UniProtKB/Swiss-Prot annotation:
EC number: 1.13.11.11
Free-text comment on the cofactor: Binds 1 heme group per subunit.
Biological function: Heme-dependent dioxygenase that catalyzes the oxidative cleavage of the L-tryptophan (L-Trp) pyrrole ring and converts L-tryptophan to N-formyl-L-kynurenine. Catalyzes the oxidative cleavage of the indole moiety.
Family classification: Belongs to the tryptophan 2,3-dioxygenase family.
Keywords tagged on the record: Dioxygenase, Heme, Iron, Metal-binding, Oxidoreductase, Tryptophan catabolism
Organism in which the protein naturally occurs: Cupriavidus necator (strain ATCC 17699 / DSM 428 / KCTC 22496 / NCIMB 10442 / H16 / Stanier 337)
Disulfide bonds: none
HAMAP family hit by this protein: T23O
The protein's name in its UniProt record: Tryptophan 2,3-dioxygenase
Keyword Heme: yes
Record text on subunit structure and interactions: Homotetramer.
Protein's pathway: Amino-acid degradation; L-tryptophan degradation via kynurenine pathway; L-kynurenine from L-tryptophan: step 1/2
Amino acid sequence: MSEFKGCPFSGAASEAGTKAQGEGWHGAQMDFAKDMSYGDYLGLDQILSAQHPLSPDHNEMLFIVQHQTTELWMKLMLHELRAARESVKADSLPPAFKMLTRVSRIMDQLVQAWNVLATMTPPEYSAMRPYLGMSSGFQSFQYREIEFILGNKNAAMLKPHAHRPEHLALVETALKTPSLYDEAIRLMARRGFAVDADCVERDWTQPTAYNASVEAAWLEVYRNPSAHWELYELGEKFVDLEDSFRQWRFRHVTTVERVIGFKRGTGGTEGVSYLRKMLDVVLFPELWKLRTDL
């Protein structure tokens, strides 16, 4: 029997390693003078050079990165929400299920992200706050578009974006377009559920409001899920989404209170008091009420 001498692949590995030193590392391409690299594909030069602290305080970088990454996640949320709305509008629900699940998981990610910002203490935030001016997350056009697509509409919220016509156009379109939930209600009407006509065609700039005929339609779905499985699953995807959205809002409130207490927000709002009022917003009222009425 021949003597065992280490790994049977050691010779090949050694040879490959020698070759790798000359041509790459473990077969990896090392020269990108003529090819697209990882950083090129992701536009990292632009992304990583977009942080410009205005104060000398060390902690401002955290504040900037926290909000910039949130905006990137919101960009993906909007990408998915718009596509989900189009799928529902086209009576094609399975693709919407995947998209809505992804949005919920993004919101879960953003809930956890508040834990990073919460490492900023009140004195640390106070040192950089004067440099923020009147800038505030309240002015995020992407967040406002998300709220409008989910049905929480308010025409007064267009004004903070009037100075940027390209942003105003996006938010205004979301205000005037049926929300994701509106399209679900219209789908139920197309499928024969007795939904009031003024829920199918209405002033889309108005926020979602509870309607008894819509709850009755959802109750029919929930009382016989097997007969209406797609709509039943859609309803649960909506509840998952709003559940995650509520947690995101709640962690926003608690993080702000932890860092600034009840001071007014930089954008002029009442800060924590304003954010607490937003916790009372219900996006899909019939889907929550039916849980009591079942």
